[in-house]
């Protein structure tokens, strides 16, 4: 039988760490974290009631007071005091991250430390967590690359084991790799279905409805609420008629419809799902002006187009259930052989759109990787309507933030 005294001691250890974090007492935190012998991972302990980790506690303690106790609005001295609190909070956050705190750990309210900072209006602390997320994701992406190189030299069975270990980076819905690994009970219930992988999607039966395209697991492949985004993307890419354009991923055909309105000279469409291809043919896409349909995955089709010397003035990328690594390969290895020097390209920017901090992190990650590949990117902020009622009958709400950032990429000068 477990000694209840031991349980109390463990709880006291946890509460002592959380208290030191909320008091921004770095010397005490250092002593508690580095000398603790009873907790396996003291920098990431959790409060059983709130789910707060030390990062949450350090940030929540910076919540500003709007009024004095007597109800009088203040600014001067309290403003200085608040600044001092936030500076101490920032130093504590920095220390905890250096000690191995998980930047995107979830509390019982389904909030990461960055979510708490954003909700409380703590901009500098929020940006600090965004930067921590960027560093973590860049490192993970690089490590994924190293694992791929190692897999090439291993036996097939070992390679399969490695693949099993990295399946979590596959995209769910329209978003990029899931950035929040910890889950609440609600999230776990939502994610009990099969993993969303590109191979499973391509083998699945699809449901075509007026306002959505669903796979057999009720994942939203494309939805009508994206229409305004697609219209603006097409006009950004094709400001004049007579241009040559490539779209990777037809889906419901929303963006291709707007591309047609711009009267392109050539309109190439790559579509990998056989049921979508059949629907395209049923709707007569193959007979539309300038349209060429390429059936298959872009990984198989684009090298042939490059070999044929086919070039485009505009490219759009919107695939389903591919990883960020696939996307990076697309713009790092393929676009350069297909896009004219003065051409532009864009993509559906759904990376990390399940929460604002994830979206902000992946915007910065993408910017850095695009720069490494030789591209400049501009972003246009587009306000979105409330989408709460859009997800009825859909397994996972792949968009949970208030606005969309439309990317427009071109070669660096």
Curated annotation (Swiss-Prot):
Monomer. S-adenosyl-L-methionine-dependent protein-arginine N-methyltransferase that methylates the delta-nitrogen atom of arginine residues to form N5-methylarginine (type IV) in target proteins. Monomethylates ribosomal protein L12. Disulfide bonds: none annotated. This is Protein arginine N-methyltransferase 2. Residues 65-85, 148-178 are annotated as: Disordered. Keywords: Cytoplasm, Methyltransferase, Nucleus, S-adenosyl-L-methionine, Transferase. PANTHER family: GUANIDINOACETATE N-METHYLTRANSFERASE (PTHR32379:SF1). Belongs to the class I-like SAM-binding methyltransferase superfamily. RMT2 methyltransferase family. InterPro entries: Ankyrin_rpt-contain_sf, Arginine_N-MeTrfase_2, RMT2/GAMT_Mtase, RMT2_dom, SAM-dependent_MTases_sf. One of its GO terms (biological process) is methylation. The gene is rmt2. S-adenosyl-L-methionine binds at residues 201, 230, 250-255, 271-273, 298-299, 318.
